[in-house]
Design a protein with these regions (language model features):
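Small-residue-enriched flexible segments
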Residues: 1-234, 238-251, 256-283
Length: 283
């Protein structure tokens, strides 16, 4: 397992260094790479991984806590770290999947102003004006910190390499901008997604089912489950293990809640997204 500090936000260097160490420890070809990322530079971390392990599937998520206030830590090789990136190289038969299960609504607009993970304008209008119009709710009702829970069932979706990914609006600001857990950039087309609580639960089974197709006989499951989805599920998150057992049988399971997930919906192209399920099945 490799680990590297994300110094000065240099995710590329951290991803490259940690992946090199993990592959060296494995001593052979990796079937998959399992991430425990640091929230913020995930897209750059994935670029660093791809530089040393092109085409190797990536599965995992970013370390989380009870709230996104920077207290979360990463762990690797018997130690805990802060502001680090950890990655494990795994050999043997594996299957993997990266899904979210949101339905497209057809309500979409082009990003006209954005910086980093903050969206300012959609179609030349305040981002929150467009979003509240789409969901038919007042900004006074769902704005500010309330957005993080409301938007779990109504995220904004982006399309890349023919796949639809989810971005989580986690906060809105007085100027009408919206903060996300994934990068925003001018020219992106964002579309409103939607899902019921029942749908969020069922999608966990779907993700593991898709991952299990990659192996003959599943022997273990690792699921990086979005912490934001857990907010919407509440106590019903306890239904997830039964959903997985119904899907693939009584297979040992390890799961964790992540603040942002990494995975490969397209072979060899790792992507960072939010409100997602990143599943790894060992064969």
């Amino acid at each position: 397992m490799g680990v590297a500090a994300v110094g000065d936000g240099d995710g590329f260097a951290a991803g490259k260094t940690a992946a090199e160490e993990a592959l060296k420890q494995l001593g052979g070809d990796a079937s998959a790479l399992l991430t425990l990322a640091f929230m913020g530079p995930e897209e750059e971390i994935l670029r660093g991984i791809a530089a040393v392990a092109p085409g190797v599937p990536v599965v995992g998520g970013s370390a989380s806590d009870h709230s996104p206030d920077g207290k979360f830590q990463q762990f690797a090789n018997g130690h805990s770290y802060k502001n680090h990136f950890a990655i494990a190289a795994i050999g043997g038969p594996v299957g993997y999947a990266f899904t979210n299960g949101y339905r497209l609504t057809g309500k979409k607009a082009t990003v006209t102003k954005a910086t980093g993970r903050t969206l300012f304008e959609l179609g030349g209008r305040r981002a929150m004006d467009v979003y509240t119009e789409w969901v038919a709710r007042a900004e006074s009702e769902i704005g500010g910190g309330a957005l993080v829970s409301f938007s779990v069932q109504y995220p904004l979706l982006f399309h890349k390499d023919g796949i639809t990914y989810s971005a989580h609006p986690v906060n809105s600001n007085p100027d009408g901008s919206m903060d996300f857990g994934a990068a925003m950039s001018p020219g992106m087309i964002l579309e409103l997604g939607e899902a019921s609580v029942n749908g969020l639960i069922a999608e966990a089974g779907n993700a593991v089912y898709k991952a299990a197709l990659g192996v003959g006989q599943p022997k273990g499951i690792l699921l990086a489950h979005c912490g934001g989805r857990a907010i919407a599920l509440g106590d019903r998150i306890r239904e997830i293990p039964a959903e997985l057992e119904h899907t693939v049988g009584n297979v040992p399971l390890i799961g964790y809640l992540a603040f942002g997930e990494q995975g490969c919906s397209v072979v060899g192209i790792p992507t960072h997204a939010d409100l997602s399920l990143s599943a790894l099945v060992l064969g």
